[in-house]
Structures are given as structure tokens and as C-alpha cells.
């Protein structure tokens, strides 16, 4: 049985983000634990399809790239001004690194991917077993064409 295209793309994204020095841990699901911060979770969000020709169909695989950093006192250096500000600066750096990593190789090393669209970012707060984390969700849209004949 062949590996689904969505799984192949997810692995490409995980591999690319895992190589960033600003990221401590990448998770293939939304289960986050205390193995390293900032943490990133890559999860499928949606799949979109569109007729392209009699032989090909366009598909868009949408992934959430959730970036989290805890706001607890244990994670903030003493010299920092404030926990929320520090968490937001750490996350902003990871966002920048993720987007730059995708933009510099928007085909994710080729294969099934045509290109990855520019990312939208939504900032949020999250409750997790260790307290509250500041987070940002980077929406990644990966475009492909699939031969149907």
C-alpha cells in the first residue's frame, strides 16, 4: 500500500521544521508534553480539490503549524521584562524561521508538491497540563497536482 500524499507532505513539513535551531521539539499531532520549548505541532486541517484537466486534478493540503511556548516563570530568564513579552518574542522568531524555511524551498524538496502558499498566522493562548502557553498557528497550504488517468 502506498503512503497517502497528505502523509508524505506532513513528513516533509516535520523534517523541515525539525531542522530549525529555534525549535526544540516537533510533534506529529496536537499532543504536547514538556520535552522541549518552543514546541511545534503539525496537524492536518483540510483538503481541497479542484478540476484541472481531464488527466489531472489540483489538490490543496492544509496543515496547522501550531507554535507554543509556556508563560510560566520557570521558562523566562531573570533579565527579561515580562513573561508574555518574552513568550511572544520567542514565538515570533519561530514563526519567522518556519516561514523562511518554507519560502526558501517552496516545493519542499520536490516530489508531489508544486508549491506552498504564503502562510497566515493566528495568535492564541492555550491551556495545557503545565499551565498556560502563548501560541501562534501558522496555516500552511500545500498545492499539488494529481494525475487521475
Describe the function of each predicted region.
Residues 1-34, 46-149:
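Charged, amphipathic alpha-helical segments and their flanking helix caps
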Residues 37-42:
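A short glycine-rich, His/Asp/Glu-containing loop-to-beta-strand
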Amino acid at each position: 500500500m502506498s503512503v497517502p500524499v497528505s502523509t508524505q507532505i506532513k513528513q516533509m513539513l516535520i523534517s523541515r521544521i525539525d531542522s530549525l535551531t529555534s525549535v526544540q521539539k516537533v510533534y506529529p499531532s496536537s499532543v504536547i508534553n514538556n520535552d522541549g520549548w518552543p514546541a511545534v505541532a503539525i496537524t492536518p486541517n483540510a483538503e481541497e480539490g479542484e478540476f484541472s484537466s481531464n488527466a489531472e486534478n489540483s489538490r490543496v493540503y492544509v496543515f496547522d503549524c501550531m507554535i507554543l511556548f509556556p508563560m510560566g516563570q520557570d521558562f523566562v530568564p531573570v533579565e527579561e521584562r515580562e513573561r508574555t513579552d518574552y513568550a511572544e518574542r520567542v514565538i515570533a522568531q519561530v514563526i519567522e524561521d518556519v516561514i523562511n524555511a518554507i519560502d526558501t524551498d517552496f516545493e519542499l524538496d520536490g516530489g508531489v508538491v508544486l508549491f506552498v502558499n504564503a502562510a497566515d498566522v493566528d495568535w492564541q493562548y492555550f491551556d495545557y497540563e503545565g499551565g498556560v502557553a502563548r501560541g501562534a498557528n501558522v496555516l500552511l497550504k500545500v498545492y499539488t497536482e494529481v494525475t487521475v488517468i
